[in-house]
Amino acid sequence: GPSAFLRL
């Protein structure tokens, strides 16, 4: 989900 992207 979007949260996985925010972990960059």
From Swiss-Prot:
Any Gene Ontology biological process: neuropeptide signaling pathway
Residues modified as Leucine amide: L8
Keyword Chloroplast: no
Keywords from the UniProt entry: Amidation, Neuropeptide, Secreted
Protein location: Secreted
Keyword Secreted attached: yes
GO cellular component: extracellular region
Family: Belongs to the FARP (FMRF amide related peptide) family.
Purpose of the protein: FMRFamides and FMRFamide-like peptides are neuropeptides.
Name used for this protein in its record: Extended FMRFamide-3
Organism: Hemilobophasma montaguense
Taxonomic lineage: Eukaryota, Metazoa, Ecdysozoa, Arthropoda, Hexapoda
